[in-house]
A protein has these predicted regions:
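Alpha-helical transmembrane segments of multi-pass inner-membrane proteins
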Residues: 15-38, 52-73, 77, 84-118, ...
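Register position in tetratricopeptide repeats
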Residues: 416, 450, 483-484, 517-518
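Hydrophobic alpha-helical transmembrane segments in integral membrane proteins
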Residues: 233-249, 387-417
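Short coil turns that delineate tetratricopeptide repeat
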Residues: 435-436, 468-469, 502, 538
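Alpha-solenoid helical repeat scaffolds
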Residues: 408-409, 439-443, 472-476, 505-510, ...
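Interfacial juxtamembrane loops and adjacent helix segments
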Residues: 114-120, 256, 267-309
């Protein structure tokens, strides 16, 4: 009798250890969302990839430990390779991490923690409120599903009540924080994801009876809700109208870039977008609001359009088909929380950039696997990822890039202090690791420009144009050509800068100085540029604009002598 009791306890301990190890194997890679790297430049995510590499190694260790436990206790080979609780582990990992993020945000709101951006009070572990809100919106349907799935309170046991309460508390915490983020994209994503979960949990028999009995009433309710949604949509638009118009203009230019690169642009989004916006404004057939809201974005704020532009429509269609297939499988297995999270993420991706952040990429892959196929292949996937990351050298590459980004902070201090010779030496050492970062390449090129190395400066600035659409790069290249007395090339580059962002006054000021050069003197063009510099209304007024205007007036007086 005592021996049987001991065996039962050992079996329970083994099962608990297996569940705990499985949970840790899933939660550790997803936990990269909470990793912050204040020692790096704001917005850098390479530290999260370094953490991910270590987390995957830890997950592999957990899975190996589970397999050894199951082997020791005589489990079948099929059971050893399967991961039957993968979906539950993903769901509860997201709930746990979502709760941590929600508490993090509340602490920031009340001033107990610093935010990730000086302009925003609420960012969680992210750099700004947009992605933070998107992450919370993705987790909310999972919380709702686990709150609803066990039915009424009185018919569930103590452990299920604990799950229900935990999911409910995290959901309430998220609802406390989400409105304060002011992210309309995340609000819409959260609502659609949660409505889908509620719809899938409906009592079909009861709904059919009520529909037949109160059909006219429900139709009138539907019409009322439709009008409320229209008013709400208009309110969301007028909450930040320039932001909404900016997204629309951004998508318009991205679509024009797609027409030029219908099978994808291998040079990336920034290069293709910069070209398309420059071509659009050069036609001089645009509305005033378009000039006002135009910018030099790093992302398309629409993952589908950006994927088509950079990888081509075939890859985009393939990913959509895979996602829809996983959603169908998840619905068949009644994993409505996981499916609701995927739907929320898909909606959020229409007007944001989640797939540029490690936390969303890893969560997206885990959610797809959690729809059903992860029960079979999750363990091989984790083991394969570990082999690829560690044997393939990715972790070493990420670590070297992180170290370079840390050194970049010091080099940047030299650059901003005007110690350009020392900055150039530091940038040269960092170039092999950071050669695909547009901001780094611009700083290096601008530092060389300030030091008088104009040809070398153009070499790095030309590379920066591939990774960054900022017209300031064109301005510095134009100034380099002017210093080298290649005036026609300088004019071409500065006009390209004007066309890329016509709302900026600085390139007109540079053109005015160029046309005042004795060897390239053109009084008519100078007067035109002078008029624009003096009369054009700046987007943001500053003392620099006043200085440019005074200098142009002084140049005009010199030319009159």
């Amino acid at each position: 009798m005592e021996e049987n009791r001991i065996k039962i306890w050992i079996h329970k301990i083994k099962d608990t250890a297996v569940v705990l190890l499985h949970f840790l194997a899933v939660c550790s890679p997803l936990s990269l969302v909470c990793v912050t790297t204040p020692e790096l430049l704001a917005g850098e995510t390479i530290g999260q990839w370094v953490w991910f590499g270590k987390a995957v190694l830890f997950s592999t260790g957990c899975i190996v430990a589970v397999c050894l436990l199951q082997l020791f206790y005589g489990s079948s080979r099929k059971k050893m390779l399967s991961f039957s609780c993968f979906s539950a582990c993903v769901s509860w990992s997201l709930i746990l991490l979502g709760g941590i993020e929600a508490v993090w945000g509340l602490r920031q709101l009340y001033g107990f923690s610093a935010s990730g951006h000086f302009r925003y009070a609420l960012t969680g572990s992210f750099f700004n409120p947009g992605p933070y809100a998107g992450y919370l919106a993705m987790v909310l349907p999972v919380c709702l599903h686990h709150y609803m799935q066990f039915g009424t309170w009185k018919w569930v046991n103590a452990s299920l009540k604990l799950e229900k309460v935990t999911a409910g508390v995290v959901g309430v915490l998220i609802l406390c924080v989400l409105p304060a983020t002011m992210s309309r994209s995340a609000w819409v994503a959260a609502v659609i994801g949660c409505v889908w979960v509620i719809y899938m949990h409906r009592d079909r028999r009861k709904w059919n009876i009520l529909w037949r009995r109160y059909k006219k009433r429900y139709i009138s309710y539907g019409i009322g809700i439709f009008f409320v949604l229209i008013v709400g949509g208009a309110g969301a638009f007028f909450l930040k109208p320039d932001s909404a118009l900016g997204r629309l203009f951004l998508w318009k230019i991205t679509c024009q870039a797609i027409t030029k690169y219908p099978w994808g642009c291998d040079k990336g989004f920034a290069f293709a977008y910069g070209e398309a916006q420059e071509a659009y404004f050069s036609q001089r057939d645009y509305a005033g609001w378009e000039e006002r809201v135009a910018g030099s974005p790093e992302y398309a704020f629409n993952e589908y359009l950006e994927l088509i532009l950079t990888q081509g429509p075939v890859i985009c269609i393939m990913l959509i088909v895979i996602t829809l297939a996983c959603l169908w499988a998840g619905t068949q297995f009644r994993r409505y929380g996981v499916c609701g999270a995927i739907i929320a993420l898909l909606i959020f991706s229409f007007s944001s950039y989640p797939m540029h952040l490690p936390a969303f990429i890893v969560a997206y892959v885990c959610l797809l696997l959690a729809c059903g196929i992860g029960d079979i292949i999750a363990k091989p996937v984790v083991l394969s990822a570990c082999l690829i990351i560690w044997i393939g050298g990715f972790h070493g590459k990420w670590q070297r890039e992180k170290d370079a980004c840390r050194d970049w902070v010091n080099a940047r201090m030299l650059y901003h202090a005007g110690a350009y010779a020392a900055a150039n030496a530091a940038y040269d050492k960092l170039y092999p690791q950071l050669r695909e970062k547009g901001t780094f390449l611009f700083e290096y090129g601008h530092s060389l420009h300030k030091a008088g190395f104009y040809n070398e400066s153009n070499k790095y600035l030309d590379k920066a144009l591939v990774y960054c659409a900022d017209p300031m790069i064109l301005n510095v290249i134009g100034k380099n050509y002017q210093a080298l007395r290649c005036y026609h090339w300088a004019e071409e580059l500065l006009l390209a800068s004007v066309h890329r962002l016509p709302g900026r006054i600085y390139p007109y000021y540079l053109l005015a100085k160029l046309y005042a050069e004795p060897e390239f003197l053109n009084r008519e063009k100078f007067e035109e540029m002078k008029r624009i510099v003096l009369m054009k209304a700046p987007k943001i007024h500053s003392t620099a604009i006043e200085e440019m205007r005074r200098e142009v007036e002084e140049i005009a007086k010199e030319l009159e002598k």
